Amino acid sequence: MIKSILIINNHGKPRLIKFYEHYSEEKQQQIIRELFLLVSKRTERSCNFLEIGNNSNIFDKDTKIIYRHYATLFFIFCVDSSESELSIIDLIQTFVESLDKCFENVCELDLIFHIDKVHYILDEMVMGGLVLETNPTIIFSNYEIQNKLEKAENPLLSGLAGVMQTIKPNK
């Protein structure tokens, strides 16, 4: 099972945080700090899989860290021992490809200004720590459908707001 998914920039600023297990706010902050320290000090040639084992007082013994470093961002998945490392690496690649399709060459600013859409894309792929979809074409198609629905709703909402402003109660 996937325990958490994080995107952290090179300076340690979290850009996306998704926990599939309940942790207190303090523990979440500890996890973010420890994950950044673990992955940021590794070289480009290092393996992208980390077995935590007994080396941490934050994570369970069976926790594995699987990450990829793209440009200025670390895509980090914390999983239990039942998950395949290679399938999670593929899932990270699928996530990045889906983001690239949706944002036409995704960058860190897209994650900052469109975090709701990033969460939507992630929720198309993973729900409750379980992988739902791994096909970027299907993920992008669902994203496009959602965008069309949002655009169809907005004229109604803005038109309703305009009508409400023109109606003034009699005093």
Curated annotation (Swiss-Prot):
It is found in: Endosome membrane. It comes from the Eukaryota. Keywords: Endosome, Membrane, Protein transport, Transport. GO terms for biological process: Golgi to vacuole transport; protein transport; vesicle-mediated transport. Pfam families: Clat_adaptor_s (PF01217). One of its GO terms (cellular component) is endosome membrane. CDD domains: AP3_sigma (cd14834). Its main location: membrane. Belongs to the adaptor complexes small subunit family. Part of the AP-3 complex, an adaptor-related complex which is essential for the compartmentalization of the endocytic pathway. Adaptor protein complex 3 (AP-3) is a heterotetramer composed of two large adaptins (delta-type subunit and beta-type subunit), a medium adaptin (mu-type subunit) and a small adaptin (sigma-type subunit). This is AP-3 complex subunit sigma.
